[in-house]
Amino acid sequence: MFVIIGYIVCFGCIFGVYVLHGGNVQVILKALPFEIVTIMGGALGAFVVNNQPKVLKATMAAIPMALKGSKYTKERYMELMAMLYDILQKARKEGLMAIEKDVEAPHESEIFKKYPTVGSDHHVIEFTTDYLRMMVSGNLNSHEIESLMDNEIETHHQEAHAPVAALARLAGALPAFGIIAAVLGVVNTMGSVGQPPSVLGGMIGSALVGTFLGILLAYGVVEPLGGLVEQKTEDAAKELQCIKSTLLASMQGYNPATAIEFGRKVLFSSVRPTFTELEGHVKGKK
């Protein structure tokens, strides 16, 4: 919703002021189809050359996700920490071997089924169960598991930032393709120097539309979208850091109630539940 509002404000102010100053919108509309094909066609072709298929696929998936509202809400994090509390509480009361079935078949586990929002997210479940499995096996200490977690989160960070970097490169290329479109328009105009000034003026105006569109698409559309994708990737990484802090605290001997406090403290303040809110939510899920 806010993305749409932002684009409306951006385009509305730019074209609104242009019209208020007596600008002729017909000049832009007449040149628009040809300039768009030149600029976007060239930029997208370069975009394909510049990125591996996996990055292209990730970028195409990231854009629709960025346009949606964030799924990383306070309610989601409370559900995540309540789920971690339950699984750690079971391990504390009955022993680590008691959670082996939950870890090996999370989609059949009664604990994970209680929390459908995070339980249906395979990234969360895979990350959580992988390290719970290591805790059950007892082959690694907390420092070794922390190192593994850091490596996995760093890999996740690199993969998630590939679309961000790709969109940044696309935004950087669009003004240059706008200039190319403008130069082609000027070349076309120079071939018509015998035309009346009124005709030549229109042709030059159409050529300059290319430069205008290249800059507008770069800094008004693509670059802001890349920034939004980057913020969404930071939210995803923060969720993994929350799980990491909680599990490591448990391995270091803290009880489940204290362990989820470690996880709560790493969350961004805008979505971090208070101690009382989290405590009430956890008790309500028992």
Describe these PLM feature segments:
Residues M1, K71, G220-V221:
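N-terminal start-of-chain detector that recognizes signal peptides
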